[in-house]
From Swiss-Prot:
One of its GO terms (biological process) is proteolysis. Gene3D superfamilies: 2.40.128.50, DD-peptidase/beta-lactamase superfamily. HAMAP family: D_aminopeptidase. GO terms for molecular function: aminopeptidase activity. It catalyses: Release of an N-terminal D-amino acid from a peptide, Xaa-|-Yaa-, in which Xaa is preferably D-Ala, D-Ser or D-Thr. D-amino acid amides and methyl esters also are hydrolyzed, as is glycine amide. This is D-aminopeptidase. It comes from Cereibacter sphaeroides (strain ATCC 17023 / DSM 158 / JCM 6121 / CCUG 31486 / LMG 2827 / NBRC 12203 / NCIMB 8253 / ATH 2.4.1.) (Rhodobacter sphaeroides). Inhibited by beta-lactam compounds such as 6-aminopenicillic acid, 7-aminocephalosporanic acid, benzylpenicillin and ampicillin. Inhibited by p-chloromercuribenzoate. InterPro entries: Bact_CellWall_Synth/Modif (IPR050491), Beta-lactam-related (IPR001466), Beta-lactam/transpept-like (IPR012338), D_amino_pept/lipop_sf (IPR027279), DAP (IPR023645), DAP_B_dom (IPR012856). Belongs to the peptidase S12 family. It holds the Pfam family Beta-lactamase. Substrate binds at residue 480.
Length: 516
């Protein structure tokens, strides 16, 4: 396969304008050789420190594959350590996930970063290493039985890292260095778990081109699920190492990139900290990463021996940027689908308790259900499709098939309500699942929700009606990124009286609150 280097250069030149922000880096590896390496903008606007290919940036959740690689290379068979998962979930009432299901995001556990919102955290407050395990230990139920579906969950990898350090008696930073950083030639990569002290004093920026950019104030400690800082030079060395070891079936990347599956045998889209997807017409493994002020993405197309890395110190889509580079290098033009019509509306999934909203525009559909919106267009058969998702109708119901999640949703239409009296739902509620409270206040037509729990009393969040006894709670900023977004809140009644609520977002579904 021959790269279109001219097209790749043009795509690289376009990144600073298409994905506007303080700075970024991007690189491409083909057949084990670096064919492109770019750095633009500034690592710190105020101090005028330029971004360089040697500037270390947080790669965030891309770290998950390094955790899984160190696990397999150090401990081998994960099944031998399954019993240890129970130590971290002492109150769990259902079947426990295996260590492999943690690595494959098939645990069914709720994401602990989303739960920090419900435990009363503020976006910029300090979250110490010792704060995580007590929060995880409160879990009593999950989204679904382990191994039956996919749900992104950071605490899966926190548990994995704790078991790995305990079994080896060694720090994760040393295992990374010995098993991956050293062999791969990642000379400056290291585990920098405390986000208050970023490597090379790089600054990440919240905001946008429309409102301006301001430094992100991060205070979380993360390990296993994220925490590695690496330069573009380090990441391109990693991609070259992957290519150099491609024919060794015992190499770390070959082992973590084996095709995953659910317990029923259905192929899965995520395994050992790697996402398996199709980008620019080719199969890739990779991962994204996010922290307030930073975005990262890497792709590896094994058959084409091609890798792409993009990291920003702002919040533009690194996934879209990396996809554009892959498409340019391969000369791929995405087929233009037709614009579906007559799909706009909102529905409620009775199983997850989550709202589905579909909007139409000139380019197609926007589906809002998971953490981020899905874009869909119609194929020749008229079916709206996007990456790993499609829509159909069964009468008035909306059928959403998320093949990447092993999930089919049959959602019921929800009439639109623009104005509702929050007075009858105002008050305090308690969630046994979380051992935490929710307070709703209503005044002069406005409604707000505040969460109180293990981490304090958080800021009041906006509460808006969307349907009969259905509201959304809006969380736009949180400790981790991206934030949970819109939580769906359903009112529960007995004999017409409000007795409780059910709250959930894609990362943390079906949490019941009883009125106090």
């Amino acid at each position: 396969m021959t790269l279109d280097l001219d097209a790749l250069d043009r795509a690289l030149d376009a990144l600073p304008n298409l994905f506007r922000g303080p700075g970024g880096v991007a690189g491409v590896v083909k057949d084990g050789q670096v064919v492109a390496s770019r750095a633009w903008g500034y690592a710190d606007l105020t101090r005028r420190r330029p971004m360089e290919t040697g500037t270390r940036l947080p790669i965030c959740s891309i770290s998950k594959q390094f955790t899984c690689g160190a696990l397999l290379d150090t401990l081998g068979d994960t099944a031998a350590y399954d019993a240890r998962v129970a130590e971290f979930l002492p109150q769990f009432e259902g079947p426990l996930p295996t260590l492999r299901q943690l690595c494959d995001n098939q645990s069914g556990l709720r994401d602990y970063w989303a739960l920090t919102v419900l435990q009363g955290a503020e976006a910029a407050q300090t979250f110490r290493r010792e704060d995580a395990l007590p929060l995880i230990a409160r879990m009593k139920t999950g989204h679904f039985p382990p191994g039956t579906a996919y749900s992104y969950c950071n605490c899966n990898f926190r548990i994995v890292s704790e078991i790995l350090e305990s079994e080896t008696g060694r720090a994760l930073r040393d295992l990374y260095a010995e098993r991956i950083f050293g062999p791969a030639g990642m000379r400056t990569a290291e585990l920098t778990s405390d986000t208050r002290h970023p490597a090379d004093e790089v600054v990440g920026y919240e905001g946008s081109d429309a409102v301006g950019f301001f430094p992100a104030d991060n205070g979380i400690f993360w390990i296993g699920d994220a925490g590695i800082s690496a330069s573009l030079q380090d990441m391109l060395a990693y991609e070259s190492w992957i290519d150099a070891t491609r024919n060794d079936e015992n190499s770390i990347y070959r082992r973590i990139s084996v095709p995953p599956a659910y317990v029923c045998g259905t192929p899965a889209s995520y395994g050992f900290g790697l996402s398996h997807e199709t980008v620019a017409g080719v199969k890739v493994t990779g991962h994204g990463g996010a922290l307030r002020g930073f975005r990262a993405q890497r792709f590896h197309a094994a058959d084409e021996r091609l890798s792409v890395v993009v990291i920003f110190n702002h919040e533009a889509s690194a996934h879209a940027a990396a996809s554009s580079l892959l498409a340019a290098a391969l000369g791929h033009e995405a087929p233009k689908g037709a614009r579906p019509e007559g799909w706009a509306g909102q529905w409620l999934d009775p199983e997850s308790g989550l709202l589905l909203r579909v909007g139409e525009d000139a380019e197609g559909l926007t589906l809002r259900f998971a953490t981020g919106p899905d874009r869909l267009t119609a194929g020749e058969d008229g079916v709206p499709r996007g990456a790993g998702v499609s829509l159909a109708r069964e009468g008035a119901m909306l059928v959403m098939n998320r093949t990447s999640d092993n999930l089919t949703v049959r959602a019921e239409p929800l009439p639109v309500v623009a104005v509702a009296d929050a007075g009858e739902i105002a008050g305090r509620y308690h969630a046994r699942e979380l051992e935490a409270d929710l307070v709703i206040e209503a005044r002069d037509g406005g409604a707000y929700a505040g969460f109180e729990g293990l981490l304090g009393a958080g800021p009041m969040e906006r509460l808006h009606p969307v349907g009969p006894d259905v509201w959304i709670v809006t969380t736009r900023r949180s400790m981790d990124a991206p934030a949970p977004g819109d939580w769906t809140l359903q009112v529960r009644r007995e004999g017409g009286a409000v007795t409780g609520l059910r709250l959930g977002c894609w990362l943390a579904r079906r949490i019941d609150y009883a009125r106090v």
